[in-house]
Amino acid sequence: MNHKDPLVSWNVFGLDVVFNLSSIMMLIITAVIVFVIAIICTRNLKKRPTGKQNFIEWVFDFVRGIIESNMAWSKGGQFHFLAVTLIFFIFVSNMLGLPFQLISGHTLWWKSPTADATVTLTLSTLIILLTHFYGVRMKGTKGYFQNYTKPIFLLPINIFEEFTSTLTLGLRLYGNIFAGELLLGLLAGLVTGDSTRAWGWIIGLPGLVVWQGFSIFIGTIQAYIFVMLSMVYMSHKVQDSH
């Protein structure tokens, strides 16, 4: 389990900027998979949907329900495609590391990109920044920042809340996916390790199968939670009351 990430460091204006090549590769693969799913499911659309069109319409309806549970559709409708893209992207990201891990030497190349805290915190930061952008856009600068100063003594708490929202949104996703893959690796080690003792197979193989199924469930739930909380934070910024 002593695997390392393929890191590359570049010096930019005197600062060392580190990139994880594995995470970058997996993010690109995730984006390609989501794009292919979208193309396949939206080709040759019909008035009476069947098969893949039924699936994509169900996803859109499901995500619409998430949005409408947090804000009026007149305001939340513009975030429909954002939320659908998020739920697909995070779900696929969560699933990629479950079937197997690709290791060259001691370098881990294939894993779920959401098992990297940098990736999940970047996603959560982008979501929080988007909530501020749309808050200012829909309320105006003055109306938006009044939410932070009414009453004035809550200003420090409101500012602190922005940081905690970013951290909890990103770290919740990272913690669940990373822990799941870590345990999968341990169970796989019992089955494929150097030891040929029967107990390794007896414990490891059933545990691996059960935990694979549980990890699929957790990955699905985490995609839902991330999108739900994103829309909750968005509604706080664009609704008339904070």
Swiss-Prot record:
UniProtKB keywords? ATP synthesis, Cell membrane, CF(0), Hydrogen ion transport, Ion transport, Membrane, Transmembrane, Transmembrane helix, Transport
Subcellular location, record wording: Cell membrane
| MF (Gene Ontology) | proton-transporting ATP synthase activity, rotational mechanism
Xref: PROSITE patterns: ATPASE_A (PS00449)
Q: Which domain of life is it from?
A: Bacteria
Q: Where are the transmembrane segments?
A: 21-41, 79-99, 116-136, 173-193, 198-218
A GO cellular component annotation in the UniProt record: proton-transporting ATP synthase complex
Q: Which InterPro entries match?
A: ATP_syn_F0_a_bact/chloroplast, ATP_synth_F0_asu, ATP_synth_F0_asu_AS, F0_ATP_A_sf
The record describes its membrane topology as: Multi-pass membrane protein
List GO BP terms, alphabetically: proton motive force-driven plasma membrane ATP synthesis
What is this protein's function? Key component of the proton channel; it plays a direct role in the translocation of protons across the membrane.
Q: Assembly state and interactors?
A: F-type ATPases have 2 components, CF(1) - the catalytic core - and CF(0) - the membrane proton channel. CF(1) has five subunits: alpha(3), beta(3), gamma(1), delta(1), epsilon(1). CF(0) has three main subunits: a(1), b(2) and c(9-12). The alpha and beta chains form an alternating ring which encloses part of the gamma chain. CF(1) is attached to CF(0) by a central stalk formed by the gamma and epsilon chains, while a peripheral stalk is formed by the delta and b chains.
NCBIfam families hit by this protein: ATP_synt_6_or_A, PRK05815.1-4
Q: Which family does it belong to?
A: Belongs to the ATPase A chain family.
Q: Which PANTHER family match?
A: ATP SYNTHASE SUBUNIT A, CHLOROPLASTIC (PTHR42823:SF3)
Instruction: Return the protein name.
Output: ATP synthase subunit a
